[in-house]
UniProtKB/Swiss-Prot annotation:
Membrane-crossing segments per the record: 35-55, 79-99, 106-126, 151-171
Classification of source organism: Eukaryota, Metazoa, Ecdysozoa, Nematoda, Chromadorea
Record topological domains on the Lumenal side: 56-78, 127-150
Cytoplasmic side of membrane: 1-34, 100-105, 172-189
Listed GO biological process terms: endoplasmic reticulum organization; vesicle-mediated transport
Protein name (database record): Protein jagunal homolog
Organism: Caenorhabditis elegans
Amino acid sequence: MSSRGVRAAGTDGTDFQNRQRVAQHYQESAQYKSILKWFFVPHFLILVFMWLKVGSELLRTNFGWKNAFFDRLDMPSAYPWEYVWCFSFIPIVLAIYSFQRNKLKILHYAYYAEFVVGIFPCMIGLGGQLPELMEYAQDMEGSNTPTFKGIFPMVIIWYIFFAVALQIHGFSMYFMHHLAAAWAPVKRD
């Protein structure tokens, strides 16, 4: 719909571009939400495998459940940090819940939960497995290291897990921090 009358003085009609741009913090918010969702996918996949491992052990020890598949895997018993890490779905749920209406407080809860149930248990496991890794590295054949299916040492699998999980948690915290900065109100002096 065109306006009636002459064009406003001092404009040639091309000054609309500044009104057509999306504010930078909205672009950053959408970008960081998307990136975080992509980090949640591998985190959730790893989490499913951990739930299967820990859950099958809980069913076997507490309820006498027997399954030929898990018996063939010959997995060692779960460490205490594994039980805590199984709760690392909480930051994912909190973060996704905060995305709906840009709830900054909920995102802060997700950020700190990422450290408490994600990074912290991994760091404890990393330190706890170090003597086992050193023992295995010094004497591969004579080591008493638990194995996966009686062949592959679990300590190597755990260190691969730590490398992947710490990167996922670290980058998730990094992008949550930047998303929170994009959502935070601008302070004016």
